[in-house]
Structure formats: structure tokens, C-alpha cells
Amino acid sequence: FYVQYDATISEEVDSYLSGLEDERMRIQKRAENKGLAQSLNDLLNIVMSAGYEYIARMDADDISELNRFERQIQYFDEHPKVECLGTWAVEIMGDGGEYYRKQMPESHEDCKKLFRKRDCMIHPTVIFRRSYIEKSGLYSLDTYFGEDTMMWAQGFVAGCVFANVPEYLFRFRLDDNFFKRRRGWKHAKGIFTLRHKVNKMLHYGVMADFWALAYAGAKMMPICMLNVIYKTARK
């Protein structure tokens, strides 16, 4: 297990991590916050060099169900061509209360079809085969945000196979500022720029740019409306 944190963290968390007596744990510390994509790439370089076949990641405040890894590895064994595997997830608020049950398509074909409009994977639920990283490369450092979206695009271009386990194996936490961070002109512009680039990479055509424009436009709406759209547009 590799744990990385950038910049400063609370003394309580630092003390907890430092006190872990588990030889499987590797703590990576960095004084400067260089962003999620750089941190993920640093860890990918480490685990790829170590020769691991499967690579999983999650954020500190999310929760994996106890059988998550068992079910995903079993799915890999039953579907040897799959290289990027996610799951369904239950979105929870800061207090742990359920907000939304998020489903994703199971098959590769349906994943690629959905990707014309929006992401087809829930990032922290994903486990990669090492072959995925070997084919697609590391996370892009050239995006304002959406490093996961670009990672999926790189995988599709490289011919990688995607799938999702149709089970709720993960709880994804939404903090109080979740929608506030995902709206505004800068975010809307970044969304359209990213999705337009993805559409060109995958030759999705003009209709996909229409969806990108609609997606970006939603980011300019009031938070109360964005909350409603966030739920209804994904059904």
C-alpha cells in the first residue's frame, strides 16, 4: 500500500500515518503540493517499477467495500482482455448520508458510447492492469483539471479495454464545497476545452461537441440548479 500526501497535513493524521506498524505500508511525503496528476504519476512510476500486475487508487476520504478488490480481481480473471475496471458507487455526503447511487456501463462498447457525453468510469473505483499504463502512458499534466478524463481518452486511443463491475463496491464522498468547486467560467471553459480535445482524439464528431458545450454551460448555473442537473442528467 502506498500513501502519498503533499504539503502539510494535520498533526493527527501525520501522527497516525507515522505510527502505523505495517510493513506493507509505504508513506510518500512531499513538502510542495504539485497536484493530483503529478502525485499519481509519481506513484505509478514506483509501482510499475516494482512489477505489480494490478494498480488501484482511491482518495483518503472515500470508502471501499470489504469485498471490492476481491470482486474486481475476480472480474479480471473472468475477462482477461479487460485492462481498466471500475465499479458502481454510492455517493455520500460529509456526514455519511447517501446522496446518489451512481451506475456506469459494464461493457467496453457501452463505456465508449457514454464517453461521447461524459466520463464512463468513476476514477477512484478503477483498477488498472499494468498493460493499460504500458499502452496509454501516465496521467496528462497539460490539463487544468480532468486528468482522469484524459487518461480514459489515452486508453481508448491506445486500444485498451474498459469495463465496470455492476455492483456498488465503493462509497464516494461529496464534501460541502463539491458543487461550488465545479462551477464558474474557468471551470466551464476548462470542461469544453478538455472535451473538445477528447472528441478530436476519438473522432466523435460535431454532436459530441454539442454535448461538451451543454456540459460546460451547466457549470455556469446556480448551485441549486447544478445540484438538480447533477442527479437527473446521469440517469
Show the residue positions of the predicted features.
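Nucleotide-sugar donor-binding/catalytic module of glycosyltransferases
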Residues: 1-184
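Non-catalytic, C-terminal membrane-associated alpha-helical segments of glycosyltransferases
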Residues: 178-235
